[in-house]
Amino acid sequence: DAEIAERIVASDRLDWSEAALLSSVLPGHGSAIAPVIGFGLTEDRQQRPPIWTPHGFTVEWLRLEPGASTGLHRIDQNQALFLVEGEWQVTYNRLDNQISRTVTEDTVVSIPGNCWRDLTNTGSAIATCLVVCAGDNRARADWDPWIGNAAAEAGWGRDANGYIAPLDLLGGTPW
């Protein structure tokens, strides 16, 4: 019974971080992440998932404030988004090749690995989705240069392990 109980993650076991993505240090990027299974995409070194054993995929909750976006990034893993609440705009690709689609709750969105993506809450209430990434490894975001440079100007970067840190603690490239 205890072993089964450890594999059930109710909302009271979620550890939300509003500093889970490098973009979160920038205005207009009010996102929060709560890992559930595996280490997922979080860049907050303090976060630990309730279920950390390998499953072949990672699961985490993503929450965006009204008008906020994750910022343009890509990861190596295939990703599926289960949109639970809110109105979303999903943007694929960069620069002149961008394609955006508006989607609503109760929708599933598939994003191929290495595809640039930006998720935006276009509604007036908090938007929430469940994010599933393929593989057991932690997903490491490759941020659009604009995001990385703006974060560095704000005094933030990522350490060698890909976790957010104050720029004055980093000795090399800030992101």
Indicate residue ranges for each PLM-predicted region.
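Double-stranded beta-helix
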Residues: 1, 116-175
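A short, N-terminal "cap"/entry segment at the start of jelly-roll beta-barrel domains
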Residues: 1-55, 160-175
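Conserved short histidine dyad/triad with adjacent acidic residue
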Residues: 38-48, 58-75, 113
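Short histidine-centered beta-strand/loop micro-motifs
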Residues: 48-53, 70-75, 92, 100-102, ...
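Conserved hydrophobic/aromatic positions in well-ordered beta-strands
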Residues: 60-62, 81, 130
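Glycine- and acidic-residue-biased ligand/ion/polar-headgroup-sensing regions
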Residues: 65-66, 76-89, 93-94
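Short acidic-glycine-tyrosine-enriched beta hairpin
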Residues: 80-82, 94-113
